[in-house]
């Protein structure tokens, strides 16, 4: 019974919440080998910039005394859409905890301006998918997490052509000039003859690199610039010390998926997105 537990909510997460959520995520991942998309680092970064939506509650918690046993959080990259993801400690499941967390979030959603909920679940999470199925949410799209080992890329033809030297590969892109345009966000812009053809965001945490938001301007697509910018990004991260490199790709984007797999990236996990429109949630 959920009456035995304490439910709270907050505008954003603090350092204490962060630690507790990470511990809860570890327990859940150890239990059923699934991934979550909690965006905790993004949330704390936005809170530090005072850019969090403070008009209402975005983080929902369930405690058994001082122990966090359930969590459901909102991430909003678009003011009209909320992405939500959460979890319940394995030994506390089937007690209605997640249902109560979702009910509280739904009340908040219906009282505020966003028009759509995107519910996220790892495709291997039986409990997550069962919950979403009960809501009759509509499938929206899927997103792969893909990973590349630096050692695999070092066997890549273009890398071998440059003697396994990432610096040489970076310099070889004589027609593609890539410069950092936002040091805080680690954004890089690629140009050809002074014209912007694309951009990418790179991250390095310990020895894990990340490639995000790789985008080629529409009129320059289909000319090999996406592959050139991807290879540049991989070589750049390797030169910075990355041993593995991760990225995310929408499974509906067949061209990008083929590009990444041909470069050596392999699927590590898949996150499924399901949609609920506000008109369908009122009264639930």
Where are these regions (language model features)?
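Conserved donor-binding loop and adjoining core beta-sheet/short helix segment
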Residues: 26-103, 107-109, 121, 200-209
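Conserved acetyl-CoA-binding loop-helix of GNAT-fold acetyltransferases
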Residues: 94-107, 134, 216, 222-235, ...
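Conserved beta-strand-loop-alpha-helix junction that forms the acyl-donor binding cleft
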Residues: 118-129, 247-257, 273-280
